[in-house]
């Protein structure tokens, strides 16, 4: 599966349940302020895949204050259950909410790759999405490098969206 959305596309409307029990509509939430959404697998994964997800979450948690001070909201999403999310968020002492996409509606809509082991389905590798206050995707980071993640996201939300080559030729 490849990403179905790209920079310049609107973030779709999809409902997700948070670790605090709150139901979030992704589209409505991002139109309040710029936002960063990390799709990850970790709570119920094992091995290298779990480490990738956990490292991405740790990087986002470490950069949370910088993002918040810049007025950027932060959330993370996995396909685990609300209870698994709550347990993971508590054990990691995360400063932001996790959202459960247990039905996989968001990952399917966005085209985020998943892996299955029996009934356990997880995000295959972390994917970060930066969305501006108009609900427009500014960046999709499919190969998350934890050390550079926060800088990449902040840069994506501070720079104008580049004009696509085909758009540039039609506007002349």
Each language-model region and where it sits:
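Chalcogenol-based redox active-site neighborhoods
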Residues: 1-172
């Amino acid at each position: 599966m490849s990403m179905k959305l790209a920079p310049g596309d609107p973030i779709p409307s999809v409902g997700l349940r948070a670790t605090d029990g709150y139901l979030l509509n992704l589209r409505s939430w991002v139109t309040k302020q710029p936002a960063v959404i990390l799709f990850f697998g970790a709570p119920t994964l094992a091995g290298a895949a779990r480490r990738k997800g956990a490292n991405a979450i740790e990087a986002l948690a470490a950069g949370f204050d910088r993002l918040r001070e810049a007025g950027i909201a932060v959330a993370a999403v996995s396909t685990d259950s609300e209870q698994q999310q709550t347990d993971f968020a508590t054990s990691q002492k995360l400063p932001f909410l996790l959202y459960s996409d247990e039905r996989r509606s968001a990952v399917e809509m966005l085209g985020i790759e998943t892996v299955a082991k029996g009934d356990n389905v997880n995000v295959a590798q972390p994917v970060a999405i930066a969305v501006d206050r108009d609900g427009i995707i500014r960046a999709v980071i499919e190969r998350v490098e934890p050390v550079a993640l926060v800088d990449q996201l902040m840069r994506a939300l501070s720079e104008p969206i580049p004009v696509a080559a085909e758009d540039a030729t039609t506007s002349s």
